[in-house]
């Protein structure tokens, strides 16, 4: 019986070893360039003597992203929040091609430290609105609610005054 168990263990180990090869070219994901997709958002953090973790603990908080269908075309669009970069909204044109509609949609933001976002139809009109959270040490830290007007234009309709 011991010999049979040893034989089965040996065969099992050999099967595992033989099946573990790393020569497969079957990739599940392919990296697409920003020239192919149109998505070129970069939230680059530039540290210096006055802007670093010790003087500004929020420096590594942020760079959020929300994904949702803002124009009801059954294609998911992308909204990025930036810390040292402008917020960006990309409209999905299909086949992983996006248009940057940040300026025309009015969602670029200002000099706040944007840390995250979510999409929700807050006013129940059938279009996704964008809620953007803000952090920081100085200045106004009100979160922003961007209301989708249904024509790829957003208006800032409310602010969350958390008192922080």
Predicted segments, located by residue:
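C-terminal motif of bacterial Sec signal peptides marking the signal peptidase cleavage site
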Residues: 18-19
């Amino acid at each position: 019986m011991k010999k049979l168990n040893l034989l089965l263990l040996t065969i099992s180990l050999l099967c595992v070893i033989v099946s573990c090869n790393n020569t497969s070219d079957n990739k599940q994901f392919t990296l697409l360039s920003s020239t192919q997709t149109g998505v070129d958002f970069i939230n680059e953090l530039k540290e210096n003597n006055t802007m670093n973790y010790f003087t500004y603990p929020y420096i590594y908080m942020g760079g959020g992203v929300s994904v949702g269908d803002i124009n009801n075309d059954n294609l998911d669009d992308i909204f990025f929040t930036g810390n040292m970069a402008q917020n960006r909204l990309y409209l999905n044109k299909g086949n992983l091609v996006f248009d940057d509609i940040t300026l025309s949609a009015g969602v670029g933001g200002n000099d706040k430290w944007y840390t995250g976002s979510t999409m929700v139809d807050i006013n129940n009109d059938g279009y996704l609105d964008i809620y953007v959270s803000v952090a920081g040490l100085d200045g106004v830290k009100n979160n922003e609610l961007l209301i989708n007007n249904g024509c790829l234009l957003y208006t800032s309709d409310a602010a969350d005054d958390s008192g922080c």
